Amino acid sequence: VQWTAEEKQLITGLWGKVNVADCGAEALARLLIVYPWTQRFFASFGNLSSPTAILGNPMVRAHGKKVLTSFGDAVKNLDNIKNTFAQLSELHCDKLHVDPENFRLLGDILIIVLAAHFAKDFTPECQAAWQKLVRVVAHALARKYH
């Protein structure tokens, strides 16, 4: 995938403002609340019985931070995302058997979280760059499935 200088700037500029722990926790919690069937991959996380339980679950918070920290690797390696996520793709495909559609859903939720947190900075141009990024990351994570 090719990135313009403007796209790179919009992505890295916004990423520098992101609180990975807070935005990661919110994104994963929203995924589990909005798309409850995704909860089956997190059975070991304990109580996911309600939005309040999910939002207060420390394991959801910790894994959300881990997910978004990993997403930061994509931001740092925009020109090599496929290889950056090769091992994670293998893990999610071969060991965890995660439906690759869930990567797209999480990407869409991340867009919503970023827009909510950075409304002033999240211009249509910024959104377009981030939509492209989450699409590329989702594709890289789903690569092992193809």
Swiss-Prot record:
Superkingdom, natural source: Eukaryota
GO molecular function: haptoglobin binding; heme binding; metal ion binding; organic acid binding; oxygen binding; oxygen carrier activity; peroxidase activity
GO BP annotation list: hydrogen peroxide catabolic process
Disulfide pairings: none
Keyword Ribosomal protein: no
Residues in Globin domain copies: 2-146
Residues that, per the record, bind heme b: 63, 92
Keyword Transport: yes
Pfam families, A to Z: Globin
Keywords for this protein: Heme, Iron, Metal-binding, Oxygen transport, Transport
Complex formation: Heterotetramer of two alpha chains and two beta chains.
UniProt protein name: Hemoglobin subunit beta
Lineage of source species: Eukaryota, Metazoa, Chordata, Craniata, Vertebrata
